[in-house]
Amino acid sequence: MLILIIGSAPDALEAQNLKRELFGSIVAINNAWKVRKDWTNCIYPEDFPENKRPKSSKTQTLHSSEEYVKAQNHFGGFVYAGGTMAFTAGYWVLYKFKPQIICYTGCDMV
């Protein structure tokens, strides 16, 4: 299974050109849910404003620190990865989906 993680850097728009059927899930970090309408998961930190979060549905779920802290601690905690949401999302994806490949776009921290 391949998982796509989309961040908020300018090249995140490249995700619009990727075929949905390639990915088991599409995980958006923070505002990246606006890049594609077919995202499946949106992960965000505690300080991400509630009015900027998308609405959840049966096929699109929201995930906060209540979930990803447990996942990150499973892999050694924030000491090893820091608070960068690109790394946090990666560890959460690894913990939740156990994918063969994690693909990133828009996470180059420009």
Language-model regions, residue ranges each:
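Acidic/Gly/His-enriched mid-domain segments of enzyme catalytic cores or analogous surface patches
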Residues: 12, 17-103, 107-109
